[in-house]
Amino acid sequence: MQIFTILLLFNIFPSIFVQNLPDTTVAPRTKRTIKIGIAAAQRIQTSSIGWSVCGGAVPLAIERLKEMGFVKDFDFEYIVDYTECDLGSVVRAGMEFIKTHKVDVIIGPPCAQALRLMSFLAENYKKPVLGWGFVSDTDLSDVIRFPHLTTVIPNSLMLGYAASKMLTTFHWNRVALLYYFSDVKYCSGVMNDIEATFNDPSTPNVNIVIKAEIYLNDNETTDNVFQTVKSRARIILWCTQTSVEKRDYLIKIATHDMIGDEYVHIMLSMRNVAFGTQTSLGKPTFSQSGLTPIWESFTEGTDGFEKMAKQAATRMFVLDVNSEVADKKYLEYMQKNIIKAVQSPPMNCSTVECMTANTTIMGGYARHLFDVVYLYGIALTHTNSTDPAVYGDVDVLVHQFVTSFQGMTGHVVISPNLTRMPIFQLYGLNSDYDQVALVDFTYTNSVMVPNVTLFYKDEGGAVWSYYGHSRPLDIPICGFLGKSCPVSFWEQYKILIFVAIAVIVLMVLIMIIGCLCVISGKRAERARINAEWQVPFAKLIESEKQVRGKGASRRSLQSAPSISTGHSGVTTVSDFCENYTMMMYEKEMVLTAKYQYTHLTKADKERFVKMRKLDHENINRFIGLSIDSAHFISVTKLCSRGSLQDILSRGNFSMDYFFMFCIIRDVAKGLEYLHKTFLRLHGNLRSATCLVNDSWQVKLAEYGMDNLVEEQTPPKKRLLWVAPEVLRGSLSVSQMEPSADIYSFAIIASEILTKKEAWDILDRKEDCEEIVYNVKKGGLFPIRPEIITDIHDVNPALIALVKDCWAEVPEDRPTAENICSQMKGLVSKQKTNLMDHVFNMLEEYTSTLEEEIEERTKELTLEKKKADILLSRMLPKQVAERLKAGQTVEPEGFDSVTVFFSDVVKFTILASKCSPFQTVNLLNDLYSNFDTIIEQHGVYKVESIGDGYLCVSGLPTRNGYAHIKQIVDMSLKFMEYCKSFNIPHLPRENVELRIGVNSGPCVAGVVGLSMPRYCLFGDTVNTASRMESNGKPSLIHLTNDAHSLLTTHYPNQYETSSRGEVIIKGKGVMETFWVHGRFGEMEPTELRSISNRSTPPVTNDRWIPNPSSSHGSRPSSVYDPLQGHQKFKMDTLKVAN
């Protein structure tokens, strides 16, 4: 009633208290004195909040602040009033602090009710209040009601939610609440808040079976309470204010036999001491907090209860604010000097309590008083001013309270509502009786539900080490009085047990019989399975009619006829490079290979059983193994097209990109399947073990045979497919990794892409051993096959993938699964099946074959005509026909022919004035037009050598005596043409000919097989050559025989004259003649010049060329000398200048 009267007066007449308040604004000065008003208590709860054992914390805190660099610009003055938590005294002291002493800050009374009153008073005068002691009531955290109050003690409501979380963590929901009586009613308030949190609908339901108050010196009441607790609960939450009461509780629960494995005593505290007490008697301390264990006596000696209290402490846990102090040495210093500090200046406490205080004990809340003063000093320093208008402004100052620091009560964090954000921890004792934190309950952002962190992994060993490593139950199995134990299983189910035993025995007998049957069946099944993979040697028949396909014709894709399944229907199959043998088994052709006889283990046999079950389109099916002969013989399905090595070695087939892609994809799919099976890898992959069936589908063979030794020593060439890490380590298949298969796959892919053997070994300068050595050697740039393909549309990504697969480091190679995944995007989605692709190719080939044949036939006919024309230009037609027919051309004699020789006069001089190209072009122009003139006459051009020109008439087609006329006419045309012929690069030079003609017998024939030539033999030819060499420029020189033929058979047609007798080399003296032209075509002056010549009469007969003659088939053109020599040039190759 007293407090309400005081508050009413304070609210009605506030002017009484503030009317004489002077202006606080003063001139700034160098150092400012801070006045601290302290409402202390000496006679209540002396060991906890007594000023004699706590007051020294204030000057020690100021001293520590200055050591840490704070409050250097301030001095402090203390005004202490012992209010003893009396409400009237609190109001009086508050008014004196504010009105009389004009304090800057008030350290409030250490009791919750008194602190509320002081806070109301200070709020009206804008003074900050620091709370400590028993001030954990929840309403004191209301920043709206108490905006200027701050404390380092968390409120008990937070403790309640932490306790609720703890019970949930250990699955307890039935508890007892016990608390010691005190005048300040601290524990009573705490338990009220605990009860409120347990009843909060947002928390798990907790059944409070008893809530009782116990007394330190009232053993009768306490005994009754403990007896009631024993009959109702095993999980006890209890609260006390002093260390004496803590030790008293331990001794009492030990006396009442409440320290068994069923009991859990959890002390609720917010004093940051856990299992410790604040004393300086020199007794052992905890390593974490630096405090003395509560089971130690409070005297320098012992009182005989230490062992009992220590044993009881093993059944106790403490839920307290984190008590770990960072600076334990200063805490020890504080414990030793706190009494001295309160007695010495500036406190100068001279009361009886201060002067007689026990120097070995520090007050329970002394550390909290230290921390709250330390907090004020930090906030004061952070105002960065000694101006009272600044630090005296409480609204500015309270914002600086929101901070954190390492204090004597652990890590202090002040929230925006000016209360401490606690870290509650559940403490227990380890095997060394040292307190350890077991569970952490952390509050963040003012949320009332803490976060739980467990500091242990094994709950039984860490938390319940003193409980037999088993968590106690909140309700004992036998009840609280031990009378509700369940009936033993034997007594309750004795009859049922006998019946069950009989049934079990009967079932065991049935099971034994069943097991025997199962074992027998499994043995029979195992024998049957073994019989499946064991192929009797007697059933393997070598086919006498087996025919290799070496002599058989093969199509472009190496197709071969199918193999009949009967004994009588044996046909050809492809060759095998490996030592395979084709045999008959169960009326089917199979592929076999021999191995040396070895001992087969149980694991080998089980593997063969599993191998028979392997089924994949790219795996060659394993039929079995013959083990009843001198050798082991493996039997697999026959692939009629042989192996990839066989196909590539023959090399007489075409393969486009999609065909290559499908072959490589089949190998990759086979590997992917094997790598996922029990075999794990192939281990012997090479192109010889990749077999191809009729459908051009690749199937991997020789897998799972690594424990068998081949009958013949394998060639070193097989090492070309082996990965470098296998070569270096000489690894067996069981030691290899699947990446070794990937390397072998890359070598096979390179064979397919290049359509050559591995490493192109046939065209490579290194032999197998050198290649294997270099691969084994490795290095920064290891040797690898070259991928050079003649297929233009090969996807570069496929080549890149192959190169990735033969990477030197096994880990860098892709897996078979990755290879298959990447290959899906390397070909058009419309193309998926190789046989469909082959059929499409055949259809396209069939549709275009007829057109191609017709076109080729036309081309062949045209080329044949061209060849015939060319051949007819080289040889006479009839001679060429006989040569084309494969007939021998016999030499043939002719009685009368005329031979023509010509030569360019002074050709050497002309050639010296020309470059070689110009010389060739000169002769080409001249002789091309000569050839045109020849075509108009019955003359055959034999050859032209340099500037020499040889022609003949009268062979190979006989023309009577017309040959002399043809030669003379042609010679006159030659002379006429030379008069109009101009040399482009020598316009002043003229071309003149010397012509020699002779008639007589001759022999002609084809000489030679390489570049055959139609040659003339006989003296007639030599004499004609002498006529040319002894002739004169621009004149036609005839022998007497030729002249006689001309004048006899063609009289009066040609104007000739005798040259007289001339000495001819090899002939002696000969009379020769000149031909000047034809009558009627010569100028009159020319006729007068030769009128005195004697000329035989001639006739007007003319020779008509035979259209069936050899030269008659050549293309001809009409020669007109008036048109110039350009008209007669042929379309022949002309060498450029």
UniProtKB/Swiss-Prot annotation:
Ranges of residues in domain Protein kinase: 557-826
Location, primary (coarse class): membrane
Note on domains (UniProt): The protein kinase domain is predicted to be catalytically inactive.
Species of origin: Caenorhabditis elegans
Catalytic activity: GTP = 3',5'-cyclic GMP + diphosphate
UniProt record, GO biological process: cGMP biosynthetic process; chemosensory behavior; chemotaxis; intracellular signal transduction; receptor guanylyl cyclase signaling pathway; response to lithium ion; response to potassium ion; response to salt
Keyword Metal-binding: no
Protein's name according to its UniProt entry: Receptor-type guanylate cyclase gcy-1
Protein family: Belongs to the adenylyl cyclase class-4/guanylyl cyclase family.
Keyword Phosphoprotein appears in the UniProt entry: no
Cell compartments where the protein resides: Membrane
Transmembrane feature ranges: 495-515
Record key words, sorted: cGMP biosynthesis, Chemotaxis, Coiled coil, Glycoprotein, GTP-binding, Lyase, Membrane, Nucleotide-binding, Receptor, Signal, Transmembrane, Transmembrane helix
Pfam families named in the record: ANF_receptor, Guanylate_cyc, PK_Tyr_Ser-Thr
Residue positions with a glycan: N219, N348, N358, N384, N417, N451
Signal peptide start-end: 1-18
GO cellular component: plasma membrane
Domain of life: Eukaryota
Annotated coiled-coil segments of the chain: 840-871
